[in-house]
Swiss-Prot record:
MF-aspect GO terms: transmembrane transporter activity
Sorted UniProt keywords: Cell inner membrane, Cell membrane, Membrane, Transmembrane, Transmembrane helix, Transport
UniProt xrefs under CDD domains: MFS_MdfA_MDR_like
Biological source species: Salmonella dublin (strain CT_02021853)
Encoding gene per record: mdtL
Family as reported in the entry's similarity comment: Belongs to the major facilitator superfamily. DHA1 family. MdtL (TC 2.A.1.2.22) subfamily.
Record-linked HAMAP family: MFS_MdtL (MF_01530)
Protein known as: Multidrug resistance protein MdtL
Location within or outside the cell: Cell inner membrane
One cellular-component annotation, GO: plasma membrane
Membrane topology (UniProt): Multi-pass membrane protein
Record field: transmembrane: 4-24, 42-62, 69-89, 93-113, 131-151, 158-178, 217-237, 247-267, 271-291, 295-315, 328-350, 355-377
């Protein structure tokens, strides 16, 4: 079991590392490529577009050909794309490399969740996904620090050499440590209930959890997107104060994420999901009534706590009905989360909604819709029947 957890964690970490590792070198990259920082900031959107593109295909390929081949190819693509970015001499080539990086990271991301669905039951999966969420919260804090230390002695290209090395390590883990977990054979009595036709992506329970996780990701990405404006322009923080504040909020996310597995031993998953949405609602109300920086910071802290306590549980429930189509389900969740959150941020910007109101709106909207879905759509018997562990059921 340890090999699956190690490989899944490594596969997921390529995604946040690809976002955060290079940011510290952005001014120097812009100068060397004769591009403005504003022009290169689109690299974030290009990276997410690459991830979404990979997710369109990676899940189905993983279900048909196996998790291991997709993981290996994804790691190789990420490694080669990182080298392409390091060799870029102008902006368009750099952005092409970023798009390919997103494709590699997206394939690995999808496979990681499919592996966890294949090897863990619902209770253990919820705990592991919560831990995984905590680990991914460490990357936005550590990656810029590591990047800064690297650039003290080496040029910005070394940041992408480091990411390329990460791709090599993940590829080697996938090649030599990871075992194939894709279900290859079911007992005859299970064929009818576990067929791809039965594992529908439009069943009410999956759609409800897809909506909850998409709204939750929209909350956290809106917070990340709006935080520079809120903290530095509205609240008057310096860059140093901003960095410290974001590090502290990441710390809150880590503490709550690492505590959630223990909470799952005491409370039902539904209870933790309701707590999560209750924290979102409280955060929205707090921010709407806040008149001091202290109260605003308290509201922002509630956002991080709410996301960390509920997201892993909701993702585990969403993957639960799928024993044969875990890859497709993981892809669908990833695409919905990336596209849904991007659509909200884009619409809010087009409509001229302020950063604070954008955040308050998604917090209150997410909490109300999610609470209604949690109460109205509960796991039924057919969902429980699909909750099998294909890898463990092999002879």
């Amino acid at each position: 079991m340890k090999r699956f957890l190690l490989c899944s964690f490594a596969l997921v970490l390529l995604y946040p590392a690809g976002i955060d590792m290079y940011l510290v070198g952005l001014p120097r990259i812009a100068a060397d490529l004769n591009a403005s920082e504003a022009q290169l900031h689109i690299a974030f959107s290009v990276y997410l577009a690459g991830m979404a593109t990979a997710m369109l295909f990676a899940g189905k390929i993983a279900d048909q050909s196996g998790r291991k081949p997709v993981a290996i190819v994804g790691a190789i693509v990420f490694m080669m794309a990182s080298l392409l970015c390091s060799r870029a001499s102008e902006g368009s080539l750099f952005l092409s490399g970023r798009f390919l990086q997103g494709i590699g990271a997206g394939g690995c991301y999808v496979v990681a969740f499919a592996i966890l669905r294949d090897t863990l039951d619902e209770h253990r999966r919820a705990k592991v996904l919560s831990l995984l969420n905590g680990i991914t919260c460490i990357v936005p804090v550590l990656a810029p620090v590591v990047g800064h230390l690297i650039m003290l002695r080496f040029p910005w290209q070394s940041l992408f050499y480091t990411m390329s090395a990460m791709g090599i390590i993940v590829g080697l883990l996938s090649l030599f440590i990871l075992r194939e977990t894709r279900p290859v054979r079911l007992a005859p009595r299970d064929l009818s209930r576990s067929s791809p036709a039965a594992e529908s992506l439009i069943n009410r329970f999956f759609v409800s959890r897809l909506a909850i996780t998409t709204l939750s990701v929209s909350v956290i990405l809106t917070f990340v997107n709006a935080s520079p404006v809120l903290l530095m322009e509205v609240m008057g923080f310096s860059r140093g104060d901003y960095a410290i504040t974001m590090a502290l909020t990441a710390g809150v996310s880590m503490v709550v994420s690492f505590s959630t597995p223990f909470a799952l031993g005491l409370f039902k998953p539904r209870t933790l999901m309701l707590v999560s949405q209750g924290l979102f609602l409280t955060a929205g109300v707090t921010l709407s009534l806040a008149h001091t920086n202290t109260v605003t910071l308290f509201g922002l802290t509630l956002i991080c706590a709410g996301f960390s306590v509920g997201f892993g549980v909701a993702m585990s429930q969403a993957l639960g009905p799928f024993s044969l189509r875990a890859g497709v389900a993981s892809s669908t969740l990833g695409i919905a989360q990336v596209c849904g959150s991007s659509l909200w941020i884009w619409l809010a910007a087009i409509l001229g909604i302020s950063a604070m109101n954008m955040l308050i709106g998604i917090l209150i909207g997410c909490s109300i819709v999610s609470i209604l879905l949690i109460f109205s759509v509960t796991p039924n018997r057919s969902v429980a029947e699909h909750e099998e562990i294909p890898y463990q059921s092999r002879p």
